[in-house]
Curated annotation (Swiss-Prot):
One of its GO terms (cellular component) is nucleus. Regulatory subunit of protein phosphatase 6 (PP6). May function as a scaffolding PP6 subunit. May have an important role in maintaining immune self-tolerance. The modification Phosphothreonine is found at T631. Protein phosphatase 6 (PP6) holoenzyme is proposed to be a heterotrimeric complex formed by the catalytic subunit, a SAPS domain-containing subunit (PP6R) and an ankyrin repeat-domain containing regulatory subunit (ARS). Interacts with PPP6C and ANKRD28. Residues 724-749, 853-873 have a biased composition (Polar residues). This is Serine/threonine-protein phosphatase 6 regulatory subunit 3.
Amino acid sequence: MFWKFDLHSSSHIDTLLEREDVTLKELMDEEDVLQECKAQNRKLIEFLLKAECLEDLVSFIIEEPPQDMDEKIRYKYPNISCELLTSDVSQMNDRLGEDESLLMKLYSFLLNDSPLNPLLASFFSKVLSILISRKPEQIVDFLKKKHDFVDLIIKHIGTSAIMDLLLRLLTCIEPPQPRQDVLNWLNEEKIIQRLVEIVHPSQEEDRHSNASQSLCEIVRLSRDQMLQIQNSTEPDPLLATLEKQEIIEQLLSNIFHKEKNESAIVSAIQILLTLLETRRPTFEGHIEICPPGMSHSACSVNKSVLEAIRGRLGSFHELLLEPPKKSVMKTTWGVLDPPVGNTRLNVIRLISSLLQTNTSSINGDLMELNSIGVILNMFFKYTWNNFLHTQVEICIALILASPFENTENATITDQDSTGDNLLLKHLFQKCQLIERILEAWEMNEKKQAEGGRRHGYMGHLTRIANCIVHSTDKGPNSALVQQLIKDLPDEVRERWETFCTSSLGETNKRNTVDLVTTCHIHSSSDDEIDFKETGFSQDSSLQQAFSDYQMQQMTSNFIDQFGFNDEKFADQDDIGNVSFDRVSDINFTLNTNESGNIALFEACCKERIQQFDDGGSDEEDIWEEKHIAFTPESQRRSSSGSTDSEESTDSEEEDGAKQDLFEPSSANTEDKMEVDLSEPPNWSANFDVPMETTHGAPLDSVGSDVWSTEEPMPTKETGWASFSEFTSSLSTKDSLRSNSPVEMETSTEPMDPLTPSAAALAVQPEAAGSVAMEASSDGEEDAESTDKVTETVMNGGMKETLSLTVDAKTETAVFKSEEGKLSTSQDAACKDAEECPETAEAKCAAPRPPSSSPEQRTGQPSAPGDTSVNGPV
């Protein structure tokens, strides 16, 4: 509806573009210019692709706006120009990448003096980055021609946007070969050496930080690329250059030259920490990141890096003792003089990374310098510095979990470990770790007893104590730790054992989260039986709680089904009794023992299931009760052999006349069929009882009770067919409906002898008598053999035997002559009726027994009609 009436607001840009004197600024003043550009507005893109427009857009980006402009709109046009050029329109990217004059104009921004405008630098970096991503070959070729490009990048590295541009140049090129060419080109330009030179105390802090971050990102990107492309034949040239020993020595020489500059030291340590990221398992809880199929050479630390760092361990140790001067810091806890500082914190991080490599030579140097003792003193001195406490805890855990000797880095020096963990002995004996823990714990308890505050490192101290206990029980150094504890003085050992069983145990018990016995959450009032209280003690409850957690029933016991016990909702047992909309989907399992009766009934059911075309009755109920008429094939079929089952009308349904047209004489114990028409929508048939085909039954059993499923009383066994009582039940308005798959007249209802139907069904008295005698004489044979159903009729002066067969095309059961030569038409039957009108009149005058149909019970005359038995097969 919104688009139908054209209620959407049209863009004003199209109106502006129709003017010949429209300017670029007028278009940029429109609010929806960016949306129209990204929506590929053809007129707008054609306008922007003009040479003067592209040149103006680039000029807005690289030129400083006037100082006298309002600050709110000063950078409006540069911002919109950047967004238009980076809207990723292929036509604009192609024009910028192919026009060298525009590229040169854009490149001229780097020629400005430092520092660059950070906002304009971000616009420039964004435009050039998308050009590198979309047109890598053209842009890289253009930059290679500019011999001062790397110099300008180094010159403006203090601007974060320029640092981002350098990283974009390394990451935006996806094809392997062009990327390798860029790496080789940058390595030839000595980008690594130039960045390392920037990390110098004489440089500014921003340049320190950006140069360090650039080198760290180069290391990470190169290693990630090596993990992704394992089959790469060429190593990353930038990473190989940075890992050289002389480059690391140059970096360390810069930061320790003359004065101590915290910014330069921290930036250099950040580079070293990135190079020491081994990504290998260290102590319990750490997971190996190196892929299984990847050799550890790609994940391990380069030997040259460790050798270069080892030569400067003394300088780093001096930083722990005498850091760069810092002013006194006042905190809520007290006065820090001097504070820990970023320098010493990063030095401790570097020591923890070196301990992770587990290099025997570096471990020996750390023991000689007593660096572990220094950082342990800092742990207890600075009570509230959790960054420091975390790093000290990691160092102690690494020492406790490190194996005896380093097998991978054993070739670094000639001195290998002797199989004895000297650093672990140093931690227990010289650093006196156990004594320091006990003293700090007792001091904290004494302070808390006096009403003081708990020390801030107590949580980390608890974890360190638990790590020692864990290393005593299991781990690569369990035997050595047990021996070191035994070698303690008796007093200290007893205090330690008492501490582990009392203070440490109680603390662990308080810190343990109770998973079972607290705060049961019940979903309803009926859940008490599902959540019963545990009967075991709390001390040994963890394993039992986990076992019960695995075995418990996670959901409540719900009833299987939800429903309503109301009459308007069907029960489960009544589903089979509802009316079906698709009758053709119903399948019956029929008993195949009585082939003759089954064939007859199948024919009736198949005829019933067909949708009758009654020429106007579209809403006829196909399950409405109708009368059944059985006539021989000679009276039903024409000489052509076609059936007329679909030529009926709906007059019978309109006047509501329902009358049964056949009457079984007697009940035969062998041949009986019982059908109940009392409930047409859900009628059922009983095939276990033989079909009734004999005479003698009263007429009131025919009608609504014909389909009854009740067991009839057995009667005298006689012949199943008697044609001496032929009458017609067809009227003029029912003549077209008298054709069913099998018709057999058994009713004695009176009829009009002058109607065409009566003439068609009347037979000569002699023929009728002969048929009756023949049927009576053959009654016993029919009772004995029910597999073959036959009929004997008099056709003219000849006797003819008809057998019940099923037509393969129409699937209807019909009586056919055994010789297959003679076929009696309705015209011949009409001729016989004209020759013997007395017989017809005599039959019409025969008394009619009371009927059970509604019309006969009310005393009103009912129109004769037939009932076609429809039912699914």
